[in-house]
């Protein structure tokens, strides 16, 4: 059995329409088939176009007063003159006013001018400090061949057809179902709270390592061992660790007095930890101001001046390196 779409009018009268029916007339059709007939015959009514007083209705109330429409709604309206002897139209409502924008568009039937279309936007409040909304109205009036002076005296009235719709910021029209959902939403948001998408969360964040100046042999031994066993350096690749000379605590013999080599050692360790935090092991900068030119220890710090991929991995069978001359420099 064939089904029909049912639309309710204001007086609860039902209209049975075939499936897929949409009321989408052109500008010329609105003028010649609807507005012109309404002006000639006040008793004329259209199944898809209702009647409303725009001065007594707010734009968000109009979808519920329309006979038909999902994204745009049509009405017959009588323009209210602001002054009895003037030509200005009263477009104010209780909550705001309609303001004309742009230039009126001419509507032709063939080569003959039959009407004009005016675009208006609704503003909340009172002019000139009204707040612009997304409610838009197209107002159609007779003109040219069908203008008022070409009509009989009994038809000299101010009937117009208004098409009202609500648009988004992108210019698209919003259907009535969406407007209802928007109106039902509260001020609260159902979206989850923003979360930190950074891969460096609290679990993986490492504490900065403080390297004190070496003042004695015991302090030096503990600091060197702590630096290489610190969790912040645990992510260093094995190949990188193999390029670092292994120090034996028994072979370390550091004098109690200050030594410029210790300053150099501190710079190397700080550079290593900085590179580890940045996960960039391509280069390791060594300050030229504190660089040591002695031939005995220049090879020890050579790995800091070259790219790591050019270094030769020392053989593990070579045993520990005796740095006694180095520390007693």
UniProtKB/Swiss-Prot annotation:
Transmembrane segments: none annotated. Its main location: nucleus. PROSITE patterns: NAC. Induction: Repressed post-transcriptionally by miR164. Keywords: DNA-binding, Nucleus, Transcription, Transcription regulation. Residues 114-173 bind DNA. The keyword Protein transport does not apply. It is found in: Nucleus. GO terms for molecular function: DNA-binding transcription factor activity; transcription cis-regulatory region binding. Expressed at low levels in leaves. It holds the Pfam family NAM. The NAC domain includes a DNA binding domain and a dimerization domain. This is NAC domain-containing protein 79. The lineage of its organism: Eukaryota, Viridiplantae, Streptophyta, Embryophyta, Tracheophyta.
